[in-house]
């Protein structure tokens, strides 16, 4: 597997290149450890992710977030990410949002 995982004590995230378009980063697996939630660590983790994205010379990044995940959307918005599109996911039985940022 080509997945690259980054971990801090407060949580972790993964970054992969979009197949056939290696200047786009696909960000996924972002989570804050449950024991330390609601303390601002999402923002700490996101700042670390943004540094990694820039150091890897990506031009654009995308991620998905379930519409009901208000905390994650707050982190994305504060980091300069933009809502792009929403769709209904049959697997999750709820709406999922696609977010992106130009780096």
Listing of model-derived features with the role each one plays in the protein:
Residues 29-37, 65-66:
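A short, internal acetyl-CoA/4′-phosphopantetheine-binding micro-motif in the GNAT/acyltransferase core
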Residues 1-20:
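Non-catalytic substrate-recognition and accessory regions of acyl/acetyltransferase enzymes
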């Amino acid at each position: 597997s080509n997945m690259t995982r980054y971990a801090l004590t407060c949580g972790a995230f993964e970054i992969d290149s979009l197949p056939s378009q290696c200047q786009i980063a696909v960000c996924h697996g972002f989570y804050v450890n449950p024991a330390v939630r609601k303390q601002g660590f999402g923002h700490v983790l996101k700042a670390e992710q943004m540094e990694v994205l820039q150091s890897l010379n990506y031009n654009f990044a995308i991620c998905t977030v379930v519409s009901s995940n208000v905390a994650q959307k707050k982190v994305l918005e504060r980091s300069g990410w933009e809502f792009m599109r929403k769709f209904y996911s049959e697997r999750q039985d709820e709406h999922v949002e696609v977010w992106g940022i130009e780096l």
